[in-house]
């Protein structure tokens, strides 16, 4: 089975991306063990991407293309427990930084709510869906939309509650603010609270914040430094193209977060590939 050259295809991982991820997965079969031949990890990884991209149930994985669904899901759970997808996200962000450079100067933070009809960890009544079960992802991106940090909470968690936690969850080391290295942070009016503002300023950001009740008025300094709040909204839109993320079916939050992290991996790879083309 040959790998395609772009993540625009549905489920095959490109060779160069696989070469980065494969070392994180460990041996397919423990040395000295007997029994049937192990399922190739590349095949299993492609199957996980298939689920992420198509949104199908695990049991609906085409067996003729991959392996029994129970086998694939077992390998996936093993990787989740080992933190493989979080490590892959961190690795791809470092790869993105090496190829293009993280654009720290302009960052944007916003949250999005997703339906979670089965409930589970980090779910709650959605304020935008008549109190039905939902989950929220709080996301921080750089100027291009590269995902830098993410926090998953219940849908009824106020944005301001997880804003500072999201800033503190950046998965690579953030450069110190210097005179020639200024960081701007763009927020919408949902974050217009004194504790959030104080926390953002304490983290050495120049804040661009739409004020509640003044949404149509320009922010001081925005003619010189126009805010880029739309960037993080676009990344949320990119994530929603992965059909498994449109509705959360995972009860355990670690399983859901792993799929989000894999989406971040593919988004970062696409940003680098697009720049190269």
Give the predicted meaning of each segment.
Residues 1-277:
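Short alpha-helical elements
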């Amino acid at each position: 089975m040959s790998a395609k050259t772009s993540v625009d295809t549905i489920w095959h991982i490109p060779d160069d991306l696989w070469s980065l991820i494969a070392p994180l997965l460990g041996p397919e079969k423990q040395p000295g063990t007997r029994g049937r031949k192990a399922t190739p990890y590349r095949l299993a990884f492609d199957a996980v991407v298939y689920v992420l991209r198509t949104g199908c149930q695990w049991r609906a994985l085409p067996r003729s293309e991959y392996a029994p669904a129970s086998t694939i899901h077992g390998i996936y759970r093993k990787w989740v427990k080992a933190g493989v997808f979080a490590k892959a996200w961190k690795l791809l962000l470092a790869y993105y930084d090496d190829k293009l450079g993280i654009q720290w100067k302009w960052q944007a933070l916003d949250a999005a709510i997703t339906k979670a009809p089965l409930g589970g960890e980090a779910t709650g009544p959605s304020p935008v869906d008549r109190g039905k079960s939902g989950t929220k992802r709080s996301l921080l991106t750089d100027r291009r939309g590269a995902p830098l940090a993410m926090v998953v909470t219940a849908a009824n968690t106020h944005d301001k509650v997880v804003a500072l936690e999201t800033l503190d969850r950046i998965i690579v080391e953030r450069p110190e603010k210097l005179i020639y290295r200024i960081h701007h942070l763009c927020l919408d009016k949902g974050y217009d609270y004194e504790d959030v503002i104080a926390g953002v300023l304490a983290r050495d950001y120049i804040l661009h914040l739409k004020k509640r009740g003044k949404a149509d008025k320009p922010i001081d300094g925005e003619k010189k430094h126009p805010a880029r709040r739309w960037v993080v909204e676009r990344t949320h839109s990119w994530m929603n193209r992965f059909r498994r993320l449109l509705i959360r079916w995972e009860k355990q939050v670690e399983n859901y977060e792993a799929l989000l992290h894999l989406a971040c991996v593919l988004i970062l790879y696409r940003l680098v590939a697009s720049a190269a083309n």
